[in-house]
């Protein structure tokens, strides 16, 4: 197959996306596919004489083969990317990206956050008739916006921490229940997320979250164990328990090797396992998700589950959760990536 892997972008998860994209491209090439790895924002700025040649040479915008070299030599800073791009317009999709994707059998979305995950890119690809991995524009939009996600969960009677959506600092000051969690409405990888214990901490956390987005979500803090349940083709995988060695499960805990103890399959009884998988399936269906996703949960001391949020384009880095869950089912990361590119669930 001829496959385009899209990575990079302009979200706060740009660096993680580049790492995911590099891994995905390597896995697909190991299966014999012709793979072009593109930065969706930077695009391919040279004049294209022969798109076929890009596939045959397995073009990569990172100009390297190893993961470490790829990421090290790639623009990971958003400001630097904007300055380097020749096209100075506000367009999210870089030059020649659509044209190259149109010549592929499928486009593998290794993007995280922002326009690459919130449904905008998905809708654009739909309009051009370009096949891609992951959920469509509707599910992507619902899952990316934490305020909308919470509303859907409440309408479908899926238990979730109580919370509010705020569009400015003044309105956010109405919140008076502590401890609580403050987070950007559509961010990922826990960037800009804070746990606060009192009003003074809360004001600082609100300012911090608003640096990243114009809307924030504030919700009750629930004490409990944290789990994540991946789904492939609507089938829930074994839950994985996430236990940071210190503090919250923040950006550093997610991507720094050894910062978090991740146990899969989780050390839980059959009843709890079923409860988490069933809740994940309900959330997956309620948000109109497709293909694959990951749903995050908290489990309190009473055994009550709280559905936190959904991730429509789970990471593919060495520390990513969904590949670990798939491995428990006997699906290697290479096989998982290969089969996602084929959009088949025949291995389940």
Language-model-detected regions and their locations in the chain:
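A short, polar/charged loop-to-alpha-helix boundary motif
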Residues: 249, 317-324
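Phosphate-binding site of ATP-dependent enzymes
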Residues: 197-278, 299-306
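Residue-level detector of anion-binding/catalytic polar loops
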Residues: 34, 131, 159, 215, ...
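ATP-binding N-terminal substructure of ATP-dependent carboxylate-amine bond-forming enzymes
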Residues: 1-138, 142-144, 148, 167-173
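Active-site nucleotide/adenylate-binding loops and adjacent lid/helix of ATP-dependent enzymes
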Residues: 3-7, 11, 19-22, 94-101, ...
């Amino acid at each position: 197959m001829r496959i385009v892997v899209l990575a990079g972008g302009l979200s706060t998860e740009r660096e993680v996306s580049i790492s995911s994209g590099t891994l995905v491209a390597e896995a697909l090439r190991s299966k014999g596919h012709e793979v072009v790895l593109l930065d969706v924002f930077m695009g391919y700025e040279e004049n294209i004489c022969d798109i076929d040649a890009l596939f045959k040479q397995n073009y990569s915008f990172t100009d390297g083969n190893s993961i470490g070299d790829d990421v090290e030599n790639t623009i990971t800073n958003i400001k630097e990317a904007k300055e380097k791009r020749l096209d100075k317009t506000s367009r999210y999709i870089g030059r020649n990206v659509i044209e190259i994707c149109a010549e592929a059998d499928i486009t593998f979305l290794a993007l995280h956050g922002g326009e690459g995950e919130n449904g905008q890119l998905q809708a654009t690809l739909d309009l051009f008739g370009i096949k891609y991995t992951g959920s469509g524009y509707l599910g992507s939009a619902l899952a990316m916006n934490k305020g909308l996600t919470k509303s859907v969960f409440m309408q479908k009677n899926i238990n979730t921490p109580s919370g509010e959506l705020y569009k400015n600092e003044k309105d956010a000051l109405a919140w008076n229940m502590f401890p609580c969690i403050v987070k950007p409405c559509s961010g990922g990888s826990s960037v800009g997320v804070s746990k606060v214990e009192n009003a003074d901490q809360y004001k600082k956390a609100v300012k911090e979250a608003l640096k990243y987005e114009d809307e924030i979500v504030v919700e009750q803090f629930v004490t409990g164990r944290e789990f994540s349940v991946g789904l492939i083709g609507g089938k829930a995988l074994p839950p994985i328990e996430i236990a940071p060695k210190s503090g919250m499960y923040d950006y550093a805990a997610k991507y720094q090797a050894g910062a978090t103890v991740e146990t899969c399959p989780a050390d839980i009884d059959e009843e709890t396992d079923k409860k988490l998988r069933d809740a994940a399936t309900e959330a997956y269906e309620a948000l109109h998700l497709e293909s694959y996703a990951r749903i995050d949960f908290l489990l309190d001391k009473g055994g009550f589950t709280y559905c936190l949020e959904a991730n429509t384009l789970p990471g593919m880095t060495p520390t990513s959760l969904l590949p670990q869950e798939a491995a428990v089912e006997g699906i290697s990361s290479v096989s998982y990536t290969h089969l996602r590119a084929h959009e088949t669930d025949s291995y389940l």
